Amino acid sequence: TVYLRGGTYVLNKTFELTEADGGTEDLPVTWRAYPGETVIITGSAGASLSAFEPVSGEMKEKLSPDAQEHVMVADARDLGLGEISFSLSALNLCLEAPLFSLDGQHMRLTRYPNSNSTEDWMHVETVNPNSSTSYPEFKLTDERVLGWSYQESDWLYSSYIRYGWAQGYFHGTLNRETGIVTATDTAYYGSAAGQKPVQIYNAYESLDEPGEWYYDQMSGRLYIYPFADTTRNSTLRMTSSNFDLISVNGASYLNLEGLTVTSSKKDGIVMNNVDHCVIENCTLTSFEGRAVSIDNATYSGLKNSEVAYTSISAIYLNGGDYQTMEPGYDFITNCRIHDTNQYRTMNEGGVKFRGVKNTFSNNEVYNITDMALNF
């Protein structure tokens, strides 16, 4: 057993384990947190909340009365967190943006309305619907949104503008006289006639709930609405490292136990070509990729762990051979899997489960805006 003493380990490259680091059936190798101590492995050094100051002046007045006394701001360039950027994936089906956490609590990019349910979103009438790839138009009638004026170019629209299963993202221009929004990014499936659900991300005036953040792309300033239990010494982390945090390649009888693995633009733990390798009693959160990816595996998997807050699916598992029907005997069991698919909610699923004779059992799966299990 390799014991890791308590503390926060900030990585600047992938921690790699290979065939040489594995064990045997009689003598497996386990990397484990020291009993009674907390081990955090992260790709983000973090920034202290003391670097922020209360919002003031004109920017304070733009916020709702409840938010005015809570929102804080800092120059993002002074925080040492890395570059904050927004982009759209291929076909504009997925938003690519960083994930933030404050003392381990997930934060959410500000949005309006504040709900995952499309029933609560704004419902807008499309204009000149077009069934092919096009720049959709719709009429915005929400008086609150029409009253917002700050940095409209920062806004990102999310909508099921054609099909109820096909979410898309786009920027747009708003004609304030007519309320017509014209997308400046294409909708792959076009748009359909009728009332369609729309949500707006990264609008400053919508910053109105604890745990939300907004980035002013012109000034480079980051605004946050802290949780009630945070202090000046709280730590803000952002997914900034562009590498998988832990990789296990070609190993056998190697286990990871009792670790908290968090914050990367890539994946948390990646296992490939492994046998009898198990992740147990771990907490994995805040990844723009997946928290866990296990491929070409036998008798390997994840158990008794919590996996949450990923931009896409939380877990990928594949083992066994479809052609020969050779079983993988891999597993995901007794895990809590929640709040995944933060920015991709179509054809992804909370868990991607592949292979032959693998087991998904006794798991609690919730707060996922896509299918729970994709297999």
Which residues fall in each region the model found?
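Aromatic-anchored glycine-rich loop motif in surface-exposed flexible loops
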Residues: 293, 309-311, 317
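Right-handed parallel beta-helix
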Residues: 252-263, 275-289, 298-312, 325-341, ...
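Asp-box/WD-like beta-propeller blade repeats and closely related beta-sheet repeat scaffolds
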Residues: 319-321
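Catalytic cores of eukaryotic secretory-pathway lumenal/extracellular enzymes that build
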Residues: 316-317, 354
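Structural detector of coil-to-beta-strand junctions
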Residues: 14, 245, 268, 290-291, ...
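Extracellular polysaccharide-degrading/modifying enzymes targeting complex plant/algal/animal polysaccharides
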Residues: 1-273, 278, 285, 293
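Short, solvent-exposed turn/loop segments enriched in Gly/Ser/Thr/Pro and often Arg
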Residues: 295, 349-355
